[in-house]
Amino acid sequence: MEQEQDTPWTQSTEHINIQKRGNGQRTQRLEHPNSIRLMDHCLRIMSRVGMHRQIVYWKQWLSLKSPTQGSLKTRVLKRWKLFSKQEWIN
């Protein structure tokens, strides 16, 4: 079996911790120094995807033509505009 070669990318993004055990053996542990940042980035992307799904859902709902939904449609549109402004500011 071949071992993976370290590329400049893996060398720069992974941090190697070498520890000594009680019996003198050395152990290597790979850690990502920016793992918290990476998780945060993934969560942001996932929330954007969720927001996009909400937008698609509301657009589909608002496209339904029904006289009883006329007033609801304007209220939802106003609320949605306020909500989306706040989301982008945050």
UniProtKB/Swiss-Prot annotation:
Keywords tagged on the record: Apoptosis, Host cytoplasm, Host membrane, Host mitochondrion, Host mitochondrion inner membrane, Host nucleus, Host-virus interaction, Inhibition of host innate immune response by virus, Inhibition of host MAVS by virus, Inhibition of host RLR pathway by virus, Membrane, Modulation of host cell apoptosis by virus, Viral immunoevasion
GO cellular component terms listed in the entry, alphabetical order: host cell cytosol; host cell mitochondrial inner membrane; host cell nucleus; membrane
Keyword Cytoplasm recorded: no
Transmembrane portions of the chain: none
Alphabetized InterPro entries for the sequence: Flu_proapoptotic_PB1-F2
Region (Disordered): 1-31
Subcellular location: Host mitochondrion inner membrane; Host nucleus; Host cytoplasm, Host cytosol
Site feature (High pathogenicity) residues: S66
Superkingdom per UniProt: Viruses
Biased composition (Polar residues): 1-27
Subunit and partners: Oligomer. Interacts with human SLC25A6/ANT3 and VDAC1. Interacts with host MAVS.
Note: Is not encoded in all strains, and seems to be dispensable for replication.
Functional summary from the UniProt entry: Plays an important role in promoting lung pathology in both primary viral infection and secondary bacterial infection. Promotes alteration of mitochondrial morphology, dissipation of mitochondrial membrane potential, and cell death. Alternatively, inhibits the production of interferon in the infected cell at the level of host mitochondrial antiviral signaling MAVS. Its level of expression differs greatly depending on which cell type is infected, in a manner that is independent of the levels of expression of other viral proteins. Monocytic cells are more affected than epithelial cells.
Stated family: Belongs to the influenza viruses PB1-F2 family.
Stated name of the protein: Protein PB1-F2
